[in-house]
């Protein structure tokens, strides 16, 4: 059992030695030199200015695009307004022409009614003449 205990102790010592080798030693954080900080700040401000300029340019371009779209939409609505005015004018002209034709259309309706009445009278006359003819033939046979 003593040999087993010594083996366990030896294994633990080996593991402890490996753990120490795996641990890195921390170095003290040192501040960069003043010149490095100044250069880094300049670089940061330069890159930030470039970034902000890009963002502002993109926003400005978006607004210009929106302005152009609004102008085109306005022009399209003006065209549609002109078309609507022309349609309205043409409709008024057609209504005036229809009003001018209305007496003639009324006359046509009256004539159509008279023709229908005349046609009915012709059918009645035809029927009456057929009756007379039938009576005449009947009297002739006697």
Swiss-Prot record:
Q: Name one GO biological process term.
A: anterograde synaptic vesicle transport
- Listed GO CC annotations: axon cytoplasm; BLOC-1 complex; BORC complex; centrosome; gamma-tubulin complex; lysosomal membrane
Per its UniProt record, what InterPro entries does this chain match?
Answer: BLOC1_su2
Which residues does the annotated region (Disordered) include?
Answer: 1-33
Specify the superkingdom: Eukaryota
Q: Biased-composition ranges for Basic and acidic residues? A: 11-33
| Subcellular compartments | Cytoplasm, Cytoskeleton, Microtubule organizing center, Centrosome; Lysosome membrane
| Keywords, alphabetical | Acetylation, Coiled coil, Cytoplasm, Cytoskeleton, Lysosome, Membrane
Q: Which residues form a coiled coil?
A: 79-127
State any single GO MF term. gamma-tubulin binding
| UniProt modified residues of type N-acetylalanine | 2
Q: Summarize subunit and interaction data from the UniProt record for this chain.
A: Component of the biogenesis of lysosome-related organelles complex 1 (BLOC-1) composed of BLOC1S1, BLOC1S2, BLOC1S3, BLOC1S4, BLOC1S5, BLOC1S6, DTNBP1/BLOC1S7 and SNAPIN/BLOC1S8. Octamer composed of one copy each BLOC1S1, BLOC1S2, BLOC1S3, BLOC1S4, BLOC1S5, BLOC1S6, DTNBP1/BLOC1S7 and SNAPIN/BLOC1S8. Interacts directly with BLOC1S1, BLOC1S3, BLOC1S4, BLOC1S5 and SNAPIN. The BLOC-1 complex associates with the AP-3 protein complex and membrane protein cargos. Component of the BLOC-one-related complex (BORC) which is composed of BLOC1S1, BLOC1S2, BORCS5, BORCS6, BORCS7, BORCS8, KXD1 and SNAPIN.
Known role: Component of the BLOC-1 complex, a complex that is required for normal biogenesis of lysosome-related organelles (LRO), such as platelet dense granules and melanosomes. In concert with the AP-3 complex, the BLOC-1 complex is required to target membrane protein cargos into vesicles assembled at cell bodies for delivery into neurites and nerve terminals. The BLOC-1 complex, in association with SNARE proteins, is also proposed to be involved in neurite extension. As part of the BORC complex may play a role in lysosomes movement and localization at the cell periphery.
Q: What protein family is recorded? A: Belongs to the BLOC1S2 family.
Q: What is this protein called?
A: Biogenesis of lysosome-related organelles complex 1 subunit 2
């Amino acid at each position: 059992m003593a040999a087993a205990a010594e083996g366990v102790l030896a294994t633990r010592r080996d593991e402890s030695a490996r753990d120490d080798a795996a641990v890195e030693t921390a170095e003290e954080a040192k501040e960069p030199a003043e010149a490095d900080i100044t250069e880094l700040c300049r670089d940061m401000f330069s890159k930030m200015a470039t970034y902000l300029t890009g963002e502002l340019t993109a926003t400005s371009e978006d607004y210009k695009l929106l302005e152009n779209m609004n102008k085109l939409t306005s022009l399209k609505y003006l065209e549609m307004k002109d078309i609507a005015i022309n349609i309205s004018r043409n409709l008024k002209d057609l209504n005036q022409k229809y009003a001018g034709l209305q007496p003639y259309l009324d006359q046509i309706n009256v004539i159509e009614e008279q023709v229908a009445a005349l046609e009915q009278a012709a059918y009645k006359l035809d029927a009456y003449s057929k009756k007379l003819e039938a009576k005449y033939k009947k009297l002739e046979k006697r």
